[in-house]
Amino acid sequence: MERPVWFRWLRVYAIGFGIIGAGVLLFKYTTPTDEELIAALSPELRQQYERERKLRQAEQQELMRIVKQTAASETPVWNTGPIKSPWERKGVSAESREQFQQVKAEQVQREELQRIREELETIRQQSANKTQEIASKKSWWPW
């Protein structure tokens, strides 16, 4: 028996709603919140995130100030003003970012070298103590 056309359309809409609803529910319950994501980070990354939070907030405030200033002016929208265009890769911002990354990498290397030096010094001290202990127990003559 042939079903009426409205029944077919009702079925199409019901199935479509079910698929979209399932997708929304999956997204809602499987996507972690910001707090859960930060809590899942390793301690080093969490520390770095906390250190750089104020820097990101300051950047955002500066960007909002520039946007308000640009919106209040009579210049055309495509004139970016103090904001550098993302297509201009030869600008100062790319160089400063590279320099910042280089300085940060050097700092991490220095800290790692300092840690290795301290660890090596403790190993040397332990080895010297152990050698001294063995030497004090043994003598040159077996009798």
UniProtKB/Swiss-Prot annotation:
GO terms for biological process: mitochondrial respiratory chain complex III assembly. Residues 124-143 are annotated as: Disordered. The keyword Acetylation does not apply. Residues 95-139 form a coiled coil. The chain crosses the membrane at residues 5-27. It is a single-pass membrane protein. Belongs to the CBP4 family. Essential for the assembly of ubiquinol-cytochrome c reductase. It has a direct effect on the correct occurrence of the Rieske protein, core 4, core 5 and apocytochrome b. This is Assembly factor CBP4. It comes from Eremothecium gossypii (strain ATCC 10895 / CBS 109.51 / FGSC 9923 / NRRL Y-1056).
